[in-house]
Amino acid sequence: MMNDALTSLACSLKPGTTIKGKWNGNTYTLRKQLGKGANGIVYLAETSDGHVALKVSDDSLSITSEVNVLKSFSKAQSVTMGPSFFDTDDAYIPSANTKVSFYAMEYIKGPLLLKYVSDKGAEWIPVLMIQLLSSLSVLHQQGWIFGDLKPDNLIVTGPPARIRCIDVGGTTKEGRAIKEYTEFYDRGYWGYGTRKAEPSYDLFAVAMIMINSVHKKEFKKTNQPKEQLRSLIEGNPLLQKYKKALFSALNGDYQSADEMKKDMLDAGQKAAQRKQPIKASPQPATRQRQQKPRQGKITKTRYTPKQKPAKSGGLFETTLIVISVLALYFAYIIFFLI
């Protein structure tokens, strides 16, 4: 929820407003508001080089913290997770009679995660989560925990499909207290642990994102939250395939994102193998008997054309081809894009 100062600032920064940096002198023309949070507002802005996403805030410390996170992403060569960083500066807004801090970053275009899954199908959920775990692994190795990990902060770009994060406001140094979180994806809310910034905190959120992606809505916890989540996982065919990874993530058993990723990959491969039907052995062809000609008469052997295979055989082969193509595409996504 925004404070009063940010609410006033949002009213002042309308489409068409131009912001000029005090120190670097770069100019940004606001086109529309993309989102807002507890510590700032994000706009689509236009520059001489194209479009950027511009985050504006009256809290210079929060801007500095987020800039450090984006720079860390770049150093770790993990820009595929978060947006690329371009510029940071201060500016004076005459219409609001206030000084603001801002930073410019890559404008990431694409549908939000839940929209993408709704359009393309639930089979994309594990593929995208495996990609997310790859990015989280790099982030954690740099000493950062994403914190406020949720579908509203995840966009799918492409083709080829690639999951990206669009808000690093909750990213926290490992070992500290998580500074921003959303209850539904927070392990403290569900009674599974503390809000200490550590890899297992993010992995709990990944499990909740998978549950939310399947059930398509957030829900309130009951008086038995752990049993509630267990029932939701075991009661859904897709989630059940990955229940080992999901239960381990919920219980905080993983020490790294790579461990969860391995279990997800193993579960996906087992599910793909179970889908492939076993091809029946072909029946040996029976030779057509030739009638022995009677003596004194020449008997022509009648030619009998081979019977066409039944339609069910063609359907079987078509099904096998489709499954093989899907398996190859799944492997392509995992081994070439992750």
UniProtKB/Swiss-Prot annotation:
The keyword Manganese does not apply. Coiled coil: none annotated. Autophosphorylated. Residues 266-312 are annotated as: Disordered. Residues 28-286 form the Protein kinase domain. ATP binds at residues 34-42, 55. SUPFAM superfamilies: Protein kinase-like (PK-like). This is Serine/threonine-protein kinase YabT. It comes from Bacillus subtilis (strain 168).
